[in-house]
Amino acid sequence: MMAAERGAWICFEDEAGHTLRPSKARTWAPRGRTPVIPVSGKGSGRISVAGLVCVKPGQRTRLLYRVKVHRPRKGERRSFAETDYAALLDAAHQYLKAPIVLIWDNLNTHVSVAMRELVANRDWLHVIQLPVYAPDLNPTEGVWSHLKRSLGNLAVTGVDHLAAVVKNRLKRIQYRPDLLTSFLTHTGLTLDPEPP
């Protein structure tokens, strides 16, 4: 059944991780003065971000996300668990107030038995798996690319500072539906139904 027939939002999900090590980017400096970004090297930890780019004809494109801070603890999972994804999807359903057609990759957490059970308990949710090795079909990858470029050469003081900066940058992207739509356009996917 097509999303339009159900009045559903089409949501593309993906996840990304960020560490305290700053990503390198190009910059300008006078000749002979190599710019140096001081990094303490102290502390550790990382953050994971799960995001949904949600589209529906006649509505502005939306970005919904969750940020999870990971501090190095023995035996602790360093990514999102099935219950974290379910909480994100429940929040998206409550926010969008409509059924969701979810399109995501074949990450082991997405195809696990526990995740299939969580999906089966949500009658408003229909899941479609992206083909293997096809990140170019997911507009959320464009969000991560844009976010990574905005974090270039940024030295953070700790994992909490990194989480705050990432949330701030994602908030900026949220207020730019034209940018979010451009990520969808870049994939080559369209919302127009194919003619019979």
What are these regions (language model features)?
Residues 1-196:
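Short functional hotspots at interaction and active-site rims
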